Amino acid sequence: MEKYLSVTTLTKYLKMKFDKDPYLERVYLTGQVSNFRKRPTHQYFSLKDDHAVIQATIWSGIYQKLGFDLEEGMKINVIGRVQVYEPSGSYSIIIEKVEPDGVGALAIQFEQLKKKLTEEGLFQERFKQALPQFSKRIGVVTSRSGAVIRDIITTVSRRFPGVDILLYPTKVQGEGAAEEIARNIARANQRDDLDLLIIGRGGGSIEDLWAFNEEIVVRAIFESRLPVISSVGHETDVTLADFVADRRAATPTAAAELATPVTKLDVLAHLQNQEKRMVTAVRNVLSKKQEALKKCSQSVIFRQPERLYDGYLQRLDQLQLRLKQSLRTRISDNKQLVQARTHQLVQLSPVTKIQRYQDRLGQLDKLLGSQMALVYDAKVAEAKRLSEALLMLDTSRIVARGYAIVKKEESVVDSVESLKKKDQVTLLMRDGQVELEVKDVKTKEI
């Protein structure tokens, strides 16, 4: 009778076979990356060829040490172990080591970082700085013992003696080299007395030159305030430092030549040329001045110098005449002004004023006397006239002349209209008075 196995039993059996099979403990496999999507931790994807596919896993610790990123379609060679995953009954390879097929890992890492930094714009020409024509002090980031620093010092001293070289001794390959290169670039930028910076090393393999391909070094060069010349490896060697530097030199000697574009001989030649130009210019000026002097010496003024000031003598005579006339006019005007002011002072003198007031007072006194006499005579005549008028109005004088006066209640009656029948009136006469009663009132016809 046949015995049936459960799926779990069969899967466990296959897992045991896979785990104990020495050929599956370390498998060398080549294939093409498929279904790859980068994850923040472990990486899960497929390896395939033209006829088969196997699932693959790379733990995060191993993937971070690769130095490059896997990409869809990339051909790789891997070393790992094959295992069975029981829940799904599938098998996969756990990868422990990865190498690109045909192209080295560093080459892929180089291209990937180059692409990334290019997209950020770090290699654009607009960020390149111009190198100074004359540098007083040049900083060099390289090894203390290498031939690079010797070549730079020799070339700079030959081309332009007096330029200072400041060396920043730096580890240029191996572990920690990239960090030290970036750190010394930053140190150099903290100084105010440097004009230029050269970074570099001699030739070597891509591994030897790799520190100059590290992102930390590339960004340090990009952020440098100082212009940077990169001289890494030989002419055929190209690093990312070369792309980001302001200028690239194939050799240390070429870097030193770029750092001193103007040589001592160039300066001397320039000075000699300037000297010749100055001498020529001075000679031309002297020639022109001599010619001008010759013309002046031959002019009429120098042959008959008295003509030089004839016009001025005439002008002087005219000015003297005008001055005399002006003085006479000023003196005459001042005399008249003094006379006028003297007359004003005399008129304003207190003695003059008192005398004038006394004369006026005498005139007024005489006028007042005559006027008072006239007024007195007029008043006397007026008084006489009024006195006579008063005498005429005196009732005793009236009745003495034979007239009688009628009074009613102590008032003189001067019209019949003020009387009526039976009014009691008094009749005043020269020698007495009579009491009467009005019998009748008759108005006189006019």
Swiss-Prot record:
- BP terms from Gene Ontology: DNA catabolic process
Q: Which residues form a coiled coil?
A: none
Name the enzyme group at the top EC level: hydrolase
Enzymatic reactions:
Exonucleolytic cleavage in either 5'- to 3'- or 3'- to 5'-direction to yield nucleoside 5'-phosphates
What molecular functions are annotated in GO for this chain? exodeoxyribonuclease VII activity; nucleic acid binding
CDD domains per the UniProt record, alphabetical: ExoVII_LU_OBF (cd04489)
Keyword vocabulary terms for this entry: Cytoplasm, Exonuclease, Hydrolase, Nuclease
Reading the lineage from the top rank, the first entry is: Bacteria
Tell me a GO cellular component: exodeoxyribonuclease VII complex
Task: Extract the InterPro entries matched here.
Answer: Exonuc_VII_L (IPR003753), Exonuc_VII_lsu_C (IPR020579), OB-fold_nuc-bd_dom (IPR025824)
Pfam families hit by this protein? Exonuc_VII_L (PF02601), tRNA_anti_2 (PF13742)
Record localization: Cytoplasm
E.C. number(s) listed in UniProt: 3.1.11.6
Using the UniProt record, give the first listed, main subcellular location: cytoplasm
Which PANTHER family does the entry link to?
Answer: EXODEOXYRIBONUCLEASE 7 LARGE SUBUNIT (PTHR30008:SF0)
Q: Matching HAMAP family, A to Z?
A: Exonuc_7_L
Family classification: Belongs to the XseA family.
- What's this protein's function? Bidirectionally degrades single-stranded DNA into large acid-insoluble oligonucleotides, which are then degraded further into small acid-soluble oligonucleotides.
| Subunit structure as annotated in this protein's UniProt entry | Heterooligomer composed of large and small subunits.
Q: What is this protein called?
A: Exodeoxyribonuclease 7 large subunit
- What organism does the UniProt record list as the source? Streptococcus pneumoniae serotype 2 (strain D39 / NCTC 7466)
